[in-house]
Amino acid sequence: MENVGTEISTVSREEVLPVLATAKIARPRAAALAARPARPRPARRRFPARTLHLVDIENLAGAAIPSPGQVSEVQGRYVTSPGFGADDLVVMAASHLGLLNVALGWPHARYRVRSGPDGADLELLDVLWHEDVAARFTHVVIGSGDGVFGQAAANLSERGVRVTVVSRRDSLATSLARVAMDVVYLDTSQAAAA
């Protein structure tokens, strides 16, 4: 057999790409989609809009071991200040000595326990640093006035999370107030823009 008229030639990639780019390929679905008016798409989030409340009850109550009555009083003020939604998550932190009082005074929360200096703060920071809060929540309320939360709050703000601080007026660190979008004082129940 004789190979009549068959000649193999090499074509470079640079020669093929312009031809492919201008070639019209029949794509009925693509044409239908292109003809449809463009709608603005909301940013896709993996989780629905939710709020995380991180509560250092010892700081808000102003006591190392708050009584159930003090915890209930703080809860009453706190719940009316930033407002709660049905899907909000409350994480409370306290020492092992105050855990029972906290659970009795503010039921239906997730409790974290650590004793020692700044134990409650460290537990709440552990939640912020290790639980991908920015991907799961659109709003974080920090129930503490301790400045140790300043860096974590700034990181959340940079990632598009709204940060609110709930604190007693006399225990709010300036560094934390600066990075928060909103500040709510429990003792006066007035919000001040930070």
Language model features with spans:
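Domain-level signal for Mg2+-assisted phosphodiester chemistry and nucleotide/NA-binding surfaces
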Residues: 2-120, 162
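Nuclease catalytic cores that cleave nucleic-acid phosphodiester bonds
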Residues: 96-194
